Structures are given as structure tokens and as C-alpha cells.
Amino acid sequence: MRDGKELKPCLSGRGVTKVFGFGDAKTVAVDHVDFDFHEGEFVSIVGESGSGKTTLSKMLLGLISVTEGEIDFQGKPRDISNGKKKKEYWKGIQAIFQDPFASLNPRMTVEETIREPLELSGKVKKGELSDETDRIMEMVGIDERLRYAYPHELDGGRRQRVGIGRALALDPAFVVCDEPVSALDVSIQAQVLNLLQDLQEKSGVTYMFVTHDLSVVKHISDNICVMYLGQLVETTTSKELFDRPLHPYTKALLSAIPSVDIHHQKQRIILKGEIVSPIEPKPGCRFAARCPYATEKCHQPQELREVSKDHFVSCCRVEEINS
């Protein structure tokens, strides 16, 4: 719901699971995740390394297969069963990667990089390619004088602008942003985040922003989903998550955000215990081994349930802990 209007799901998933390996060495990277990313939303996926954020992103992009579950795109079951259908799917869903230097072809100029998806898609007439390339360069703030520059001649911020321009060239409905600012200087991070927001307001694109840094997404996200070892443990609006975190893991993440407030340091939650193995995990809460509130019933299967309006938590003791 935004401005009183019900938003349609852009990308949805039910029971989405990814298992690597076989036999007795199966690693459950993403475990029966349900989600709805609505049109025009800025949704952030946060969690530590190994939480399954990037694996989920790759499944949504069609870069790796889904072991179990269903994904719908723009209200229809996703079909990427062959190369032609996958190419058509990629016209509507694109990615902005973490390292702009590694994600750009070092032998292609700025103009060639942005022009390539326009040529391959066939959406733009040959005679209009140059004008459309100019429009996209201006849209993402790339100076005309850099048209023939190569990636190694650009700084990190400009390289990422090229990556953003390439991703948005085909006017996709959904864009996966895989830690797009983590490799940039702090001053440049703000510029890139502002650019992403401005482009979203103009185009209505849906963002899935993957990061391990909650402080980055606080002011830009509509909703935030917290992942831990392949499972969603909490999802709600950005304001609600920062004002009233309910899951013990979310509280620990928020307490780790650096602050100039000396009193904040005293509230830091230090997690103890061992991280459970994702190889053939046992039923129950994956966080139980590190949770200070864990009891026997935490080792029973958990489900992500709505504990207040639009606030979902996977914890059987959430009411007791937060009473």
C-alpha cells in the first residue's frame, strides 16, 4: 500500500529453496522463502555473509536454478526453460553488481557498454541508438566527454553509473542491486543511492537491494527483509524495523551499527555460541544456537508469521521476548 493505492506484485515467490550438493552433503543455501516485491518498491535484503542473500538474487535473476518452489513475474509463472524465454525474461529484470570494475568489459567504452543491450534487445531502431545512448548517459549523470572512455579510466562512482545505465537501458520492471555501494567511498555511496532513488521515482522500477549494512538502507528502503542462514527471520517496513525490531537476530544486527553516541555502545548485543552448519540442517530456528532466549521449543519448525500489521517474524517466543 502506497499513497492509499494497492500495489501489484512485481516479483513473487513461494517456498523458494536452493540446495547445493547431493547425498549426505547437501547445503541448504535458501530454505523455503516466501516473498512479494511490489511495483515501485525499494526492498532491502540484509544479513551476514552466508545468509543466502546472493543465492536468492541469483535465483531471481535466473542465473542458477531453483531446487524447489515457484517464482511469479508480473503476475505470471516465470518460464526460463530455454534460452529464448530466458532472454525475454532478462528484458524485464536486470542487475547492478557490487564491483563495477569487475562487472564491466575492460575492452568496451562507456558508449559501447550502454549501447550493447539496446542493440541486442531490438527494442530501439538502429537509427535511434545513438540518441537513446545519449539519453541514458545523461539520465545517470555521465559526462558526454566520457563517451569513449574505458572502465580503467573512470573512478568507482562513474563506473557504477555506467553499470546502472546498462541495467536500466531496457527499462526493466525489476532490478537486483547486489551491494552496489559497498566497494565505493562513503561520499560516493550517497551520490549513487540518491541516483537510484531519483531513477526509481521517474521510472517506477522495483529494487531489491542486497546488503549486509543496515545503516545504508535505513532511509532509502520501503521494506526490509532480514535473512539468517537461508531463512527470512523478520520482514516489515524500514521505519518499523528500526523503531521496533522484534527478532533477537535483528536486534543484534541493529546494535552493531556504529554510532557517535557513547551510550549506544553499552547496548551492543554480543552473540555467543556456534553458527549451525547449513549442511543438512535440523528442524527449528537456525538462530537458536546463538540466541540468549532459546528454549526447547525453539528447536521445533518455525514459520514466518504476522505479529502486527505488515510485521512478520519467525520466532515462537517473539511475544514473550518483547512483552
Regions found by a protein language model. Give the residues of each.
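Conserved ABC ATPase "signature" region
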Residues: 128-145, 254-255
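Helix-to-loop junction immediately C-terminal to a conserved catalytic motif
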Residues: 61
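Conserved ABC ATPase signature
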Residues: 150-154, 158
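Conserved ABC transporter NBD signature motif
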Residues: 69-79
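P-loop NTP-binding/switch modules centered on Walker-like glycine-rich loops
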Residues: 176, 180-184, 188-266
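A short, proline-enriched helix->beta-strand linker immediately N-terminal to the Walker B motif
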Residues: 169-173
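Short catalytic/signature loops enriched in Gly
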Residues: 2-9, 26, 235-323
